[in-house]
Amino acid sequence: MKDCVEVLKALADPNRLRVFWLLARIDERICVAEAMDVLGESHYNASRILKSLKQAGLVTAEREGKWVFYSLPAPLAGSFHAHLLKAIQAIPAENFSEEIKRCQLRLGMREHGECIVGADSDAWRNVSTQAQTKRKPAARKRHTEVV
């Protein structure tokens, strides 16, 4: 029962829930730099969020060179984790619309399926700024008459 309580505590935080929901939906691993950019959090906060999920057994970590990748562990059929994963996946996507957009942009920067861009890089700032500009409707100019 203690394990179940720890898992539910880990997901009671909105940022940890956002990361877990995204991992459950994208079915890919992410590195800390990608999590930082998607969440808009500092390296410290993103690492802490992922560490809490790992300690609760909700994600696994795999180091490859300078990158640490996080992904969901394979749940056992019928296990508490499998049921929890199904419940998390049932949360409507509109609750995470901004995170989904940012995640799609960030994962689109990968080369050969791997993260190659560090956190909060100029490349990320350019891509995310361009995407925000495209989404915002053009402001109408006010015409003022000088009499």
Feature names for model-found ranges:
Residues 37, 54-55:
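Alpha-helical residues within the helix-turn-helix
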